[in-house]
């Protein structure tokens, strides 16, 4: 069917719902095609057909009709139709299978010029296969060996094969079919890896975002242009690291050539990669060097290349790399004797081997930076959520990695079955010892030795006072931050006075407040009564949503464009008014077609009109008055003697985006609503209803109009009917939506685009935003974590005495703490409507974190910790950048790790609002013997000697707000 078109016979709402319902439950199958639809359009369709049982209000009403499928909100560039970055499933788009898409397309059509967004289902995981739709394709940089400066970008699915890429490159670079070619993966400066296994997929090959691929055509004499380089490099010293002596050769070979900047000499470094043979993966596990042998780098100061949104992984890895007990364990090869390849919960030792390989490279002292390609590939095989190239969470990666390393290195070969016992009034020390011993019977690894501690959890039934005490192991502490209570919003106020421009305001409202709170705050600044305000989300020149006063502000996203309109419920004479949404539309004739297309433009209006004066003439005059600031009226003789006809479109069944006879059924039912006594609605297709009206009202002069009106759906994309100019009252209500239809020439002559978009800034916008110095101490977060709370009604506890679920009180306490204490600051919060990041500065001590007072075990050892690493997150939730601060275990100095860049840091840089995950090392740990304990502090990043162990920290934690 034609693009943009919909079928003439659309099923009723119930049929649409029954046909699409089962299709939306389709299981993902590898290789299947699914389509993206803007969630705003899809939600409108669901309302229209009553798809959700809890939202059956006004099902099938014409004003809810969604019109053609419109995905414009998903594009960062409407021309190229490139997807915006960081789109979120269900929030920004929905995924529908092919059959569902075809039905929707047949019923509604698609906005003219838009191409369907179709994506493949790919499979992830090694043991547990997991299918997901690959929303974001991988961008690869392609070039020919003879001209590396001519780089072309192309997108591929992870399911595409190397052969597919080679075929595409041969076509792009016009390489004759009879000429042999080889494909090379260029990475890390001037290192090349041949991709010789053509049936491998992009995912199998470990290709990443922005990877450069080079195609090499064979010379006419049968030799290869790169052959000379390869033969030369074969004599260079090898620096290959393999994961196992038993590893088989990889299908990839690599060769590198580097120019040494300091001096005239040149050096080549030839490397033959080895792959991990187990599992038949065939992955290359080597990390090619780029530094000359003569250059010495401080071990551990090795950057990690960003493989495409992998800064989250790099940040977590740098923190773990600078955790001395764990790193020494791998550098001394102690892991080799403890790999558990038979653990069903493990990963056959492959995660441990990949991590060991990377750590050895990072601490070799030879590399300024490496690309952790194969480590990421291995992680993606076992944890599909990390297999793509979208931004992830460093703490989530850290949690997976610690758990994966634990299971791969678990010394327990056969886990015994253990029955959990209740405390039953026994002393805490007895129950805690029993819980820890049981934990160690099933879990015994370097991760448990280093990172595991013990919680005490106490539940009390509010009815029978039953006390339940349990002790549970933990690997890291997730500490809540005190929630901010307010939210700053920027909105536009559109006054009722047509001569006043809209004004932008900045208001502070309760974080969990209602729309009425926004109106009250705006009223205090503007002087306009809150009851005369209507709050709307404007999107693509239309109202996406008009809010009720009692709706929560958490329905409003930070990215939404919020306009607040001043309206009147009664007119000056006290009569009742109706408030109507009115859109601007421009009619555009299609080439070689008698039909016309329309496009919304400008800011929509909310117009209050007295009900007893609601005729077409008064409506036209009210709109003209309302837009008089940026629309000039034509002079009486400006159009000569003929009436102004802005396109034969108003009410035409050819009127909207290919919607031929789009709303026939709605036109029929809508006619009863437009006027008390309306003439025949049987307008001939293609005729302007204004002409029809003129024929009806003989003897009346034809008015000169800038635009005509159409009754449309809430999207403004489908016409329902024309408005009668018979002088009778129009039967319109607040759920009716109108469109002003302009022709292109009239818009050009009379519509002032610049003035229509002009607005003023209130003083609240001009003044520097006063940000509260939201600073809390780490102590506050720990106290909040250990505070007693009452369980919510949706998260009750089953009381064994009462035999029912109860909203018990719950309290966490710390019983024992590990050698390495990992503290996760819970900065991200989200619900169905709201996603936010807390930028609170948490002051944490660099040295002397005394946790003893928070440990409820009175006989416990002292717990005093010093900071060794911090994972930072800059930016908002779902976007931004991760870095790390870490203290080198050899020289005791602090360094800043930003992907491949490593720089010296000082202590006063570390405590910022970006701090996300903290790593602390216990002072009595045998590994903790660094120069920092004896060296004096200096500006070069050295640390000062600790002064005491009194209080929460030896020294006052510094804070720096990076606003």
Swiss-Prot record:
GO terms for biological process: negative regulation of protein ubiquitination; positive regulation of TORC1 signaling; protein deubiquitination; protein localization to cell surface; proteolysis; regulation of protein stability; spliceosomal tri-snRNP complex assembly. Residues 384-386 are annotated as: Regulates ubiquitin dissociation. Residues 244-253, 932-948 have a biased composition (Low complexity). It catalyses: Thiol-dependent hydrolysis of ester, thioester, amide, peptide and isopeptide bonds formed by the C-terminal Gly of ubiquitin (a 76-residue protein attached to proteins as an intracellular targeting signal). Phosphorylated at Ser-445 by PKB/AKT1 in response to EGF stimulus, promoting its ability deubiquitinate RHEB. Monoubiquitinated by TRIM21. Ubiquitination does not lead to its proteasomal degradation. Autodeubiquitinated. A motif (Nuclear export signal) lies at residues 133-141. CDD domains: Peptidase_C19R. SUPFAM superfamilies: Cysteine proteinases (SSF54001), DUSP-like (SSF143791). It is found in: Cytoplasm; Nucleus. The modification Phosphoserine is found at residues 445, 655, 675, 680. The completion of the deubiquitinase reaction is mediated by the DUSP and ubiquitin-like 1 domains which promotes the release of ubiquitin from the catalytic site enabling subsequent reactions to occur. Zn(2+) binds at residues 461, 464, 799, 802. A motif (Nuclear localization signal) lies at residues 767-772. PROSITE patterns: DUSP (PS51283), USP_1 (PS00972), USP_2 (PS00973), USP_3 (PS50235). Residues 229-295 are annotated as: Required for USP4 activation by providing conformational flexibility between the DUSP and catalytic domains. Its EC number is 3.4.19.12. The active site is at 311 (nucleophile), 881 (proton acceptor). GO terms for molecular function: adenosine receptor binding; cysteine-type deubiquitinase activity; identical protein binding; metal ion binding. Overexpressed in small cell tumors and adenocarcinomas of the lung compared to wild-type lung (at protein level). Expressed in the hippocampal neurons. Interacts with RB1 (both dephosphorylated and hypophosphorylated forms). Interacts with RBL1 and RBL2. Interacts with ADORA2A (via cytoplasmic C-terminus); the interaction is direct. Interacts with SART3; recruits USP4 to its substrate PRPF3. Belongs to the peptidase C19 family. USP4 subfamily. The DUSP and ubiquitin-like 1 domains promote ubiquitin release and thus enhance USB4 catalytic activity. However, these domains do not bind ubiquitin. This is Ubiquitin carboxyl-terminal hydrolase 4. It comes from Homo sapiens (Human). The lineage of its organism: Eukaryota, Metazoa, Chordata, Craniata, Vertebrata.
